[in-house]
Amino acid sequence: MPGPIAGVRVLELAQIMAGPACGLMLADLGAEVIKIEKTAGGDDTRKFLPPDINGESAAFMMMNRNKKGLALNLKEQEGINIFKKMVEQSDVVIENFRKGTLEKLGIGYEDLKKINPKIILCEISGYGRTGPYADKGGFDLVAQGMSGLMSITGESFDKPPMKVGAPLTDITAGILGATGVLAALINRDKTGKGQRVDTSLYEAGIVHTYWQSAIAGATGKSPGPLGSAHPLTAPYQAFKTKDNWITIGASNQNNWMNLLNAIERVDLQEDDRFKDNNSRMKNLEALAPILQEELLKKTSNEWIKIFDEKGLPCGPINSITEMHNDPHTLDRKMVIEVDNKKAGKSKAIGMPIKFSDTNANTEIGAPNFGQHTDEILMQFGYSAEQIKDYRDKGIVA
């Protein structure tokens, strides 16, 4: 079934995580995404080994399913000419190079819009294309630190700084990039013109500080790390049980009472320290140990059953493999099986948005290096003889 943006052609001139995440989202929405890799080894994640499956990088296969692969040498003018010809017949270009890289190659936005005024260029960088840090390179770790995320992650100020375990700013920047592309496509339908979309890892980190920035803006003080707790409501955190850990979200008065009924401690509501959210936040250091003592009396599954019956939001702390095998994950098709020509069958994360009428096929495996080079070039009008000549000269692979 064609996806909601079927017919849109995307040239993904990006590698590793942020740019490929953007391309993956657009591919899962139905776009034709052509991943353009350098002829000298391809996307750097192809070398992120181990783990691998039959020599194919698991990291690369995760981020690049549902795409076609072309290996193109943009250091040679003939490679640039091929890229420009592709731009003529495409809708979107995604790139995550340092500022000025495309301009030096003669394929910056001003160059591209002369070739195709409708082209949309999505630039995902460390800090964006303007501002005092625009020329700096960026990585998720650095963006998490500079955006304030690492100052609110972890257990306390006296512990070493801690980053979020997942590459949060990379993935979020990719999603923001895809959102920007979709908005630019809608605007193009109205105006007939493309435009430049500019986002960054730094900004992707900042948007995850909404609550903490609200606190800092109101008080003038920066909130710190709270472990698994919430900066504005309580109790809302992880607790140890008889055999494991669970999370409990008793973040409003109704759920607070549901929790007290479930653990048979309604008496706590009579304690002025815990009567409302404001009181509970002020006295969380006293409240948490009381709740912890009660929750150690039963196993996680026992508590989850009780809390579910009360309608109290709760859940286990799953490992990644436990999440993969959770029946809800499987029912929602968030872990899918894809097929790679060399690696064979492997697991991938599925599309997190479902549509009633336009769900696209998401189960096409990532391309092997240069797998679709001939097919793609023929699609753009090149003959078999021309392609052979380009391959012999190292223009394509």
What is the role of each PLM region?
Residues 1-190, 368, 374-397:
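N-terminal helix-loop segment corresponding to the beta1-alpha1 unit
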Residues 234-310, 314:
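Aromatic-enriched alpha-helical interface/lid elements that frame and gate functional surfaces
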